[in-house]
């Protein structure tokens, strides 16, 4: 549930805005708890904030539905992709609200689902808390779209699509996860002692996880593209360069996951990175290097960018 809090008062919050008529407070809890803390209760009599909290929870429900779908079947992956896209729509709708501004509420005709179409109604509210802010909504939109694209990629793999199609879908996944990582990294560089910061609402392991996933899908795309490049004298050098960069990027991501003080990503994500590094990237790279040394003798021009990846 979303936090619609105002000022703290003994672990509870209450909106002290102008009251007219019957005062009916709506209670919610923080979506995420601060490190080592508990989710605090929020109470507000603002209908506008109640609508925002409902939008947040609609997005949360859709993303939960997507996460629980059967990813081993095409039907399950289609459900996941559609639900993640709907969740992104709700969070994008929510993100039209920002501190001190009005909320533009837009519903698609007849469907009752959020869209990015022109606004049909506006609701003014005085202040929006961090977990309902435009910045937080942008993070959630990007994350849901990345997971929707990942579901499309997995469905394409199950359908035995061509390497060209899979490479395009994989690089789209990598780009989306890179976008999420950038947004998360930006939001996590605030003052940790501030009473309301993004650190309180975003699990820090998300940044590490999205960094690794971006490397995984970059490797998925690279491996498929290089299956063709390694068999041509004119392109084997490019293949070796791409595979080497992908190898260094994955190794950089895995080193980040091993930092003792860093938040730990899910074990399955780390294992996926280790598997594609070992079974695809290193295997294809070793084969390409041997073929080049024995047959093609292509000149290799390569500058490592692993340091740049680690600093990102």
Task: Please describe what each predicted stretch is.
Residues 1-32:
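Extreme N-terminal leader/anchor segments
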Residues 9-10, 116-121:
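Compositionally biased low-complexity segments, especially N-terminal hydrophobic helices
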Residues 14, 113-115:
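Polar low-complexity intrinsically disordered regions enriched in Ser/Thr and small residues
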Residues 34-112, 121-252, 256:
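Long all-alpha helical scaffold domains
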Residues 268-300:
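Eukaryote-biased recognition of C-terminal alpha-helical segments
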Residues 302-307:
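Conserved small/polar residues in nucleotide/adenosyl-binding loops
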Residues 309-311:
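N-terminal low-complexity segments that are often proline-rich with Ser/Thr-Pro
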């Amino acid at each position: 549930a979303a936090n619609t809090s105002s000022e703290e008062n003994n672990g509870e919050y209450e909106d002290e805005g102008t009251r007219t008529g019957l005062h009916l407070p709506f209670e919610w809890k923080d979506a995420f708890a601060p490190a080592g803390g508990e989710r605090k209760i929020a109470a507000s009599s603002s209908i506008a904030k109640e609508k925002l909290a409902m939008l947040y929870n609609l997005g949360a429900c859709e993303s939960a539905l997507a996460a629980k779908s059967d990813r081993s079947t095409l039907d399950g992956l289609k459900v996941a992709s559609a639900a993640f896209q709907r969740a992104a729509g709700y969070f994008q709708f929510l993100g039209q609200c920002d501190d001190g501004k009005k909320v533009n509420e837009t519903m698609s005709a007849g469907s009752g689902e959020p869209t990015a179409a022109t606004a049909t109604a506006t609701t003014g509210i005085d202040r929006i808390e961090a977990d309902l802010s435009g910045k937080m909504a942008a993070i959630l939109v990007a994350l849901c779209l990345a997971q929707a694209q990942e579901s499309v990629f997995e469905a394409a793999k199950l359908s035995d699509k061509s390497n060209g199609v899979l490479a395009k879908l994989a690089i789209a996944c990598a780009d989306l996860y890179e976008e999420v990582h950038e947004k998360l990294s930006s939001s996590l560089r605030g003052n940790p002692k501030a009473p309301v910061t993004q650190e309180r609402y975003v699990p820090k392991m998300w940044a590490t996880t999205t960094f690794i996933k971006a490397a995984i899908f970059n490797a998925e795309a690279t491996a498929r593209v290089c299956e063709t490049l390694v068999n041509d004298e004119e392109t084997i050098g490019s293949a070796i360069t791409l595979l080497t960069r992908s190898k260094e990027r994955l190794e950089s991501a895995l080193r980040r996951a091993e930092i003792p003080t860093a938040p730990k990503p899910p074990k399955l994500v780390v294992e996926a990175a280790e598997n594609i590094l070992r079974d695809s990237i290193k295997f294809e790279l070793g084969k390409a290097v041997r073929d080049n040394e024995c047959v093609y003798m292509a000149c290799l021009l390569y500058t490592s960018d692993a340091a740049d990846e680690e600093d990102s």
